[in-house]
């Protein structure tokens, strides 16, 4: 449903396709048919939320559900995950509802996780987890390093406290930690536990213990230590490689784990089940040679399975993105990233590296100038539009919040010049062409840039649709 004046913009075919795919996925995965009879989706004018999971009637902000100008695939992925997020709430939140707000994560973290899982497995948007990593997980990292950080499962004294916890921790960190829980107990056991949970508590109210009891029953594992360290403590750990080389082979590779910087004084070192990947330059591409899975704990864990392996061009901790931690790299890997990041042939692995570059800049370990230079070079060959869009958002923050004010104009010029070149080389009518045009408009600063904007408005870029959206970018 939408306003009559918006009917011409409604992409009913895509919305209904994604909706049907979500229903089929959730009913099969959760082992329980949709419980509420009807299911309506309404685009609401000037809505004060992105969307809301009312039983049988989901309400969306118009701009979430309806596109009035041409958009990139990233917007379609975002819409699909929002549709599936609200649909997942029919089970997580409506069929089974938290008893009190300290278990907000039973609603939001699960809906966030379920939406990206379902979109990546049931729709054509197979790289949805890359979008999560590029945009949502970065949100979690930022919020989790502020003085206002809090545990995923945290006490809520009143409704004012509740309002402050609808944040990147309750949504994106929670979803990422659920990925770690899936790795910890195994996917089949995790899904079995969810089915037991829904069957036992349908139309009831629950606490964290109710869910954990069913996951323990399904997996045969005591999850008390896991809950204590992952759900009851705040902050994000950092994982670094410690590498010893013997000739052209690894004598040893170990993973050093550092405690969170926030909360101040935290000494929390968590257990992680993760993969470590080795990647090699093969012609123009950077490809995965091998990836080993292991459990790490404490300050230092050796990856014994990689001892004796030939030295790789890139070592990636948390390959396949099963855990929640900031990542760092050895010198050889950094050199490889500078030359071949955009040529790495796995989008999720690239997303992990892009995220690490960004939080290295945010943490002051990588200068703004170096971040911009590395990123602009990699963007030349970056194929995932979610990564491209996220990087340009991060350029804005880096230049306006982190850079030396005396260097801002030079950095904006550098970004605009590189983006103009990328725009000239982009395929006509492509998502990249549209994203580069918008980014160029945001960073244009010199007289030559302004002349280029006039040319764009007059149709100089073949295939670029000059609609209201791109005009706003140019004029504002």
Each model region followed by its residue ranges:
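Hydrophobic alpha-helical and helix-loop surface patches within well-folded domains
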Residues: 1-258, 262-265, 397-398, 413-414, ...
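Non-catalytic accessory/interaction domains
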Residues: 2, 88, 152-155, 177, ...
């Amino acid at each position: 449903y939408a306003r009559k004046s918006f009917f011409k913009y409604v992409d009913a075919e895509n919305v209904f396709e994604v909706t049907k795919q979500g229903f089929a996925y959730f009913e099969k995965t959760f082992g329980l048919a949709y419980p509420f009879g009807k299911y309506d989706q309404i685009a609401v004018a000037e809505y004060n939320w992105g969307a809301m999971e009312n039983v049988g009637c989901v309400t969306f902000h118009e701009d979430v559900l309806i596109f009035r100008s041409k958009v990139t695939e990233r917007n379609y992925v975002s819409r699909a995950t929002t549709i599936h997020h609200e649909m997942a709430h029919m089970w997580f939140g409506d069929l089974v509802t938290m008893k009190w707000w300290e278990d907000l994560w039973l609603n939001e973290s699960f809906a966030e996780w379920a939406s990206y899982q379902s979109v990546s497995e049931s729709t054509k948007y197979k790289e949805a987890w890359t979008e999560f990593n590029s945009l949502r997980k970065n949100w979690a990292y930022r919020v989790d390093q502020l003085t206002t950080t809090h545990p995923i499962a945290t006490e809520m004294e009143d409704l004012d406290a509740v309002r402050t916890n609808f944040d990147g921790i309750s949504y994106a960190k929670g979803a990422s930690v659920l990925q770690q829980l899936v790795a910890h107990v195994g996917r089949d056991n995790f899904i079995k536990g969810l089915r037991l949970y829904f069957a036992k508590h349908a139309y009831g109210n629950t606490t964290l213990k109710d869910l954990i009891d069913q996951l323990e029953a399904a997996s045969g594992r005591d999850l008390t230590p896991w809950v204590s360290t992952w759900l009851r403590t705040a902050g994000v750990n950092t994982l670094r490689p410690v590498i010893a080389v013997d000739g052209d082979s690894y004598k040893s590779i170990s993973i050093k784990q550092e405690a969170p910087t926030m909360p101040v004084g935290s000494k929390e070192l968590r257990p992680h089940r993760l993969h470590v990947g080795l990647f090699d330059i093969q012609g123009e591409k950077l490809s995965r040679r091998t990836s080993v899975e292991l459990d790490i704990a404490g300050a230092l864990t050796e990856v014994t399975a990689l001892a004796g392996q030939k030295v790789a061009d890139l070592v990636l901790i948390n390959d396949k993105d099963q855990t929640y931690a900031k990542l760092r790299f050895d010198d050889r890997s950094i050199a490889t990233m500078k030359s071949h990041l955009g040529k790495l042939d796995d989008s999720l692995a690239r997303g992990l590296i892009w995220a690490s570059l960004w939080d290295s800049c945010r943490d002051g370990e990588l200068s703004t100038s170096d971040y911009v230079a590395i990123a602009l070079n990699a963007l030349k060959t970056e194929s995932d539009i979610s990564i491209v869009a996220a990087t340009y958002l991060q350029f804005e923050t880096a230049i306006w919040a982190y850079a030396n004010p005396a260097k801002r104009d030079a950095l904006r010029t550098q970004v605009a010049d590189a983006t103009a070149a990328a725009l000239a080389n982009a395929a006509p009518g492509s998502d990249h062409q549209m994203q580069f045009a918008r980014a160029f408009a945001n960073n244009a600063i010199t007289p030559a840039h302004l002349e280029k904007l006039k040319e764009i408005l007059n149709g100089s870029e073949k295939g670029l649709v000059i609609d209201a959206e791109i005009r706003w970018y140019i004029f504002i």
